[in-house]
Amino acid sequence: MDATAIHERWSVMSNASIGQEIGVEGLTGLDVDALEISDYVDETLLDGEDLTVTMIASASCTTCICTCSCSS
């Protein structure tokens, strides 16, 4: 599975979990240290190897999204 496929899979699962866009206002008071990748990844859909790769990709994507959103 390549990085693009991993990111697309993460995006679909993340959007299904969140279900809505939150603006910068929604990030006020957000404790980024308390965020868990497992909150956004349905681990039952992945095998062991896919899960490891996806969680690593998710961590980097989540960090980027949070950083970009918070710095706006």
From Swiss-Prot:
Q: Where does the record put the 4-(1-hydroxyethyl)-7-isoleucino-2-(threonin-O3-ylcarbonyl)-7,8-dihydroquinolin-8-ol (Ile-Thr) cross-link? A: I56-T67
Q: Where is this cross-link: (4S)-thiazoline-4-carboxylic acid (Thr-Cys)?
A: T63-C64
Position of the 5-amino-piperideine-2,5-dicarboxylic acid (Ser-Ser) (with C-68) cross-link: S60-S69
The record's Gene Ontology cellular component field reads:
extracellular region
Q: Which residues form the propeptide?
A: 1-55
Any one GO biological process: defense response to bacterium
Residues found modified as (Z)-2,3-didehydrobutyrine: T63
Q: How is it modified after translation?
A: Maturation of thiazole and oxazole containing antibiotics involves the enzymatic condensation of a Cys, Ser or Thr with the alpha-carbonyl of the preceding amino acid to form a thioether or ether bond, then dehydration to form a double bond with the alpha-amino nitrogen. Thiazoline or oxazoline ring are dehydrogenated to form thiazole or oxazole rings. Maturation of pyridinyl containing antibiotics involves the cross-linking of a Ser and a Cys-Ser pair usually separated by 7 or 8 residues along the peptide chain. The Ser residues are dehydrated to didehydroalanines, then bonded between their beta carbons. The alpha carbonyl of the Cys condenses with alpha carbon of the first Ser to form a pyridinyl ring. The ring may be multiply dehydrogenated to form a pyridine ring with loss of the amino nitrogen of the first Ser.
Q: Where is this cross-link: Thiazole-4-carboxylic acid (Thr-Cys)?
A: T67-C68
Cross-link named Thiazole-4-carboxylic acid (Ile-Cys), where?
I65-C66
Enumerate the subcellular locations listed in this protein's record, separating them with semicolons: Secreted
Positions of modified residues (2,3-didehydroalanine (Ser)): S58, S71, S72
Q: Which residues carry this modification: Serine amide?
A: S72
Query: Which residues, renumbered to this chain, carry the PTM (3S,4R)-3,4-dihydroxyisoleucine?
Result: I65
Q: Does the keyword S-adenosyl-L-methionine apply?
A: no
The keyword Transcription regulation appears for this protein: no
Q: Which UniProt keywords are listed?
A: Amidation, Antibiotic, Antimicrobial, Hydroxylation, Methylation, Pharmaceutical, Secreted, Thioether bond
Q: Cross-link Thiazole-4-carboxylic acid (Ser-Cys), residue numbers?
A: S60-C61, S69-C70
| 5-amino-piperideine-2,5-dicarboxylic acid (Ser-Cys) (with S-69) cross-link, chain position(s) | S60-C68
By sequence similarity, the record places it as follows: Belongs to the thiocillin family.
Function recorded in the entry: Has bacteriocidal activity. Inhibits bacterial protein biosynthesis by acting on the elongation factor Tu (EF-Tu).
Q: Kindly provide the name given to this protein in its UniProt entry.
A: Thiostrepton
| Organism the protein comes from | Streptomyces azureus
| Organismal lineage | Bacteria, Bacillati, Actinomycetota, Actinomycetes, Kitasatosporales
